[in-house]
């Protein structure tokens, strides 16, 4: 319902029970729906393990008003364009999508673009040109992840849908993103030593002779920072924590390896 004020901002008893079950099962991510602010994120954070991530679904105008605090508090956001369009209007969604992707990049947080990306493939074995362009646009804008829902869950052609999306992603990523400097220069910096080291090598990351950036990470923090820069080289993350390895696989350009033999006593994260 457009412009509806949602009054709840606390986890229900069932929510807490579901979260505890997810923790017990070893889930890597918890997704939160219909957020209005960061309160549910902070409450959820107290109930999950340190190496579990939170995905915050952006679905209403209230979340947009508080988006900075939401992005700072969460690990990833999902742009749920269907419900968002109902609340703010379809014509507003494209510019909001671009704005959210840029904001997430500034704070080194991953962003998922979702809803009806290949909707026609629920019933048909080929996509429309508009759908292909929609996927490509999200990639050009800098999205970490593009997502299928009903196309893969209940559609008649799930394999073809995944294949179509994969081909579109690979084809689009070959094209040089001239706006990449915007991402490279927009990362918010502070006195964090990891960020300082990262910024010192950012130009090298765009050197065509550099084939890969190897990130050794206990927490996934360095992988997020490197991914946010959208380097030309592939990013290989090595972590002793299998949950971290799975989480960083959501990030743009990251290939993760779980290595139980690797430990880092000197520093939490580093890269080369």
Functional labels for PLM-detected ranges:
Residues 262-272:
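Single conserved hydrophobic/aromatic residue that forms the stacking wall/gate
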């Amino acid at each position: 319902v457009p412009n509806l004020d949602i009054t709840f901002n606390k986890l229900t008893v069932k929510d807490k029970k579901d979260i505890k079950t997810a923790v017990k099962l070893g889930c890597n991510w918890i997704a939160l729906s219909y957020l209005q602010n960061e309160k549910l994120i902070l409450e959820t954070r107290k109930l999950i393990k340190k190496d579990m991530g939170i995905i915050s679904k952006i679905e209403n105008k209230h979340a947009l008003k508080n988006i900075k605090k939401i992005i700072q508090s969460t690990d990833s956001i999902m742009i749920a364009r269907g419900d968002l369009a109902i609340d703010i209007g379809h014509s507003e969604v494209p510019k909001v999508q671009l704005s959210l992707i840029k904001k997430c990049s500034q704070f080194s947080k991953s962003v998922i673009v979702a809803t009806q990306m290949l909707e026609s493939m629920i019933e048909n074995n080929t996509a429309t040109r508009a759908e292909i362009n929609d996927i490509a646009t999200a990639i050009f804008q800098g999205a970490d992840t593009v997502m299928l829902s009903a196309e893969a869950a209940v559609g008649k052609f799930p394999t073809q849908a995944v294949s179509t999306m994969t081909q579109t992603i690979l084809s689009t990523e070959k094209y040089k993103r001239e706006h990449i400097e915007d991402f490279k220069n927009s990362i918010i910096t502070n006195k964090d030593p990891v960020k300082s080291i990262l910024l010192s090598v950012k130009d090298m990351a765009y050197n065509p002779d550099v084939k890969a950036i190897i990130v050794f990470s206990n927490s996934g923090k360095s992988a997020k920072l490197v991914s946010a820069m959208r380097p030309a080289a592939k990013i290989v993350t090595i972590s002793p924590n299998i949950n971290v390895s799975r989480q960083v696989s959501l990030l743009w350009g990251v290939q993760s390896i779980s290595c139980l033999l690797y430990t880092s006593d000197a520093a939490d994260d580093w890269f080369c």
